[in-house]
């Protein structure tokens, strides 16, 4: 039996996959590790690259995109190890990442799952490294933007648990699917990833089932990985919002009572509509901001010059009629700005 089985699900991210496999190779030097790449019908030459550069990697090649959960399960069922690591292809491990995580899991038998500190490609901490359970309130606070406004609040910031230090090891509710080290015998007890979740939400569901079984989910910042985020998907797209919303509702229907699931769906709907409205207002404001400022500056310039001319050249107070300031100048400036933009 191996110490660790690493499972990477790939979908058209050849260059990121190459990066992560190099980092896995480096981090596995003194360990007994097997690595699986499950490909969801990529067309970018990913698997040819793996076979050429990483012959030690075990592969599963699907003829269609089976989704994140099912693809992971394919490899987990074939794995023979004490621990399983679900790892995104758009990540990079430190050389000590695997050794430190395995050591912690070995010393803490009550830990069912473990996640690490993640940073993005710019070195910024990713708040999804540690998350709370998406209760109706927590989901509403996140999707409405209240969590971003009050990140340190235990009430509003519960989704990403920002009141917990990013540098301290803590028990958390939810681990990120980008790096999720799991105890294999716990998976045998609670079941694998729920394949109802095609993408998004499966990590929340699995984390919740780990805690229901009496085990802990641990945020472990003693090692850091890079997660470039969303290379296989576009997080700002309408499709992402739709899929993420459906995943959250599916989680609620699965684990909450019918009444509570209904409240969850209501709060999510409300948050989505609120966020969409704010986004529309912001987009509209951002489009007219520069033309408006140009209009204002030019108009005030005309006004200042006219008043100066009246005072120091014409020596006649109110030489220009009020209509000049209220209608003529604004009209000319408006036409000029419109012509420019």
Residue ranges, per PLM feature:
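Short aromatic/hydrophobic "clamp" motif used to bind/position activated sugar donors
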Residues: 84
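Glycine-rich, basic loop-to-helix element that forms the pyrophosphate-binding segment
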Residues: 61-79, 100
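Active-site-adjacent helix/loop segment of glycosyltransferases
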Residues: 208-284
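Short, well-formed alpha-helical segments that are part of the catalytic scaffolds
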Residues: 13-28
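Conserved donor NDP-sugar-binding/catalytic core segment of glycosyltransferases
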Residues: 92-128
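A conserved acidic beta->alpha catalytic loop
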Residues: 23, 39-48, 64
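Signature of alpha-helical transmembrane segments in polytopic membrane proteins
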Residues: 40, 259-264, 274-341
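Short, flexible, basic/aromatic active-site loop/helix in glycosyltransferases
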Residues: 133-172
